[in-house]
């Protein structure tokens, strides 16, 4: 009876190794897919906001007794530092996603702890830039009567819509980086057991 149990152990051990190997390959495929999606989303967010500009002819009244003068006014992404920060942080996150994708494909074992820290830095950077861009976007959409900032999105509708799309894409990209942090942390935790 004991000889039968000992004989079946190597077979079970080999089967368990194959199951564990296939689970780690699945996690690796998931990791690669999330990195590719994060790369695409942050690249799209940087491009959508980076090409965002709109010019409108706006009537400007200088003196109440004179008629308004129609002047062309432009809204461009680089006029506001929050949007510049958003484009730069999405470009950095996109570049990092490409680099981490290459590192993940290469299969180096000792870099997982570095990758998780860098993923977490990307999450923090993207969330901070999204918050800054969203705050300025809301100022453009709603204005602020306390400091006499008027809303501008009723004039520059396409510009504001592109800002909203860029922020949404960037938020999705940052959520993917957050998922990568969680998945990598769980994988490292399982390996340490």
From Swiss-Prot:
Topology, Cytoplasmic side: 1-30, 108-113, 184-193
Disulfide-bonded cysteines: none
Keyword match Membrane: yes
Sequence intervals crossing the membrane: 31-51, 87-107, 114-134, 163-183
Keywords assigned: Cell membrane, Membrane, Transmembrane, Transmembrane helix
Domain of life: Eukaryota
Recorded topology in the membrane: Multi-pass membrane protein
GO cellular component: plasma membrane
Family per record: Belongs to the Casparian strip membrane proteins (CASP) family.
Subunit structure: Homodimer and heterodimers.
Protein name in the entry: CASP-like protein 1E1
